[in-house]
């Protein structure tokens, strides 16, 4: 009985091997050319912004405080001339009050154009590649990149600039003119 059982098992094993060799399953390829491809790895992207533009692009970023024009009230700088650290100097006109308010127009190296309100402005980083012509002044506390095929201009003020005249409480608006020097951070072009 044991010999018959062993013989039956051997025959069954041979039959299974023969069937697999003769009739491969659908998940296997009967041809001799097998190709297996595996893609492994990881991709990571860091940064706040990535730009890809065909045209022109301009960035104006103020990471400090800029005061221009005349104003009265509290929250400001009283008397004398103001100077700030960072890069940027210029003159402005208009009126503004409050903490870090910018009103009117400003021109110069590292100045802020347009109107902004609040203390401070924009800081952060951008990543990408820039081609074309670039012009900018000042330095930023971040890195700028993009991928435009046009022209770019960047104006960054990382310090403080005070100009204009003011009156009122000892904590009123700035009096006199001021310019900043130094730099904060790195700009990558």
From Swiss-Prot:
Ranges annotated as biased composition (Polar residues): 144-157
Signal keyword on record: yes
Region annotation (Disordered) ranges: 24-189
Signal sequence, renumbered to the chain: 1-19
Composition bias type Low complexity, residue spans: 25-69, 102-142
Keyword field: Signal
Composition skew (Gly residues), residue ranges: 70-101, 165-183
Protein name, entry field: Uncharacterized protein DDB_G0282077
Organism of provenance: Dictyostelium discoideum (Social amoeba)
